[in-house]
């Protein structure tokens, strides 16, 4: 790609008005965005079929003639790619556009949370797309075009993708909005606290980016004076979180309504920034948390998934048999890539209709009362992967349900929200759920009754998982979790240098 194209794209970013862009997105019919995503899919396929050695070979082995793929319906007949049948079968170089490293502006790594780490070269144009997506979200939620802002990136962990992309994007946002600055203490509690103590007072607001367990730990340790005097906004990514978690964080930072204070970005190493929460999606999730009927109507089950909106210029997402399949532009393009994540798609019209049917009110009227202006970009929801959960007597227990149990007021003063769980068997082959919990800083293992904690955690877990609640009422103490306690920062389970692994 010519340098001129990068300069033009950057000029477009710096001269754009995200508030006007968001207003246009609220007026444009949703079909415009779906059509745009389909066009992205076809364009990305054509580039890959012509220039990516691995994908050419993949099509040949699957007896697929790329010349016959002309419409989106043709596109949907293409074989799915995956880590096993595509990424792991070819050298990294052969997976790249042109089969070479030309114009690959940065390379980062996955966290290895689902296996060995992989490396992801990307074009600078991908990052510019992230800049635009974050700009739209930051203006919608945080009014960064009107307030001086300090960006605190506490997600940096060396070569891993999320922290790297956020760090670069935050710096470009600070370049665009002049009365802003960016600092990157990384996933380091002391450095983050020192940064806030030294700098926060000079800005109208502070946006802190990080992983949910770190952010929860941070707000628990935040000095009351900083929490009281600072307008804190939170961006969480890297893993899903519940509305109970959002409400807990809101309470700790003094926010009554979290629609415009706490949001998440949904991303992955292979897909980059997939989507963002806007105020509308936060509101919908907050209502769904209190209405099982709405949750089931929207998502087909009573578990509340992540819900974001995605930009159609860089990706196309499909629901194939209840799993998300993604086509993504980039230095390492992916065509109909099976993410292995359970989830689905919704249009704004779908959501408004089901909201009216279940809640009995007009969604836009309710949003207007909260000062929220919706946009019409497509929604994607994500439950996560079954292999990221533990099983107990035939039911599935997700990390999100355990996280909710651990932030209960009854035990929160003893525990952080970090844990590791697994299904274990005793000598008689009885199945048990084992949860290794991290104690708060300064709390000693011998000062806490693990058995009492097990009882409280099981009661809280029953509140968030109806299946576990039924199991507990039937089997009583036989399904109480086995609780193992570790001191704060235990190197085996809770190293601050790595992304938390919830499944052992």
Residue ranges and their predicted role:
Residues 154, 211, 237, 277-279, ...:
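Structured loops at beta-to-helix junctions and adjacent beta-edge loops in soluble globular domains
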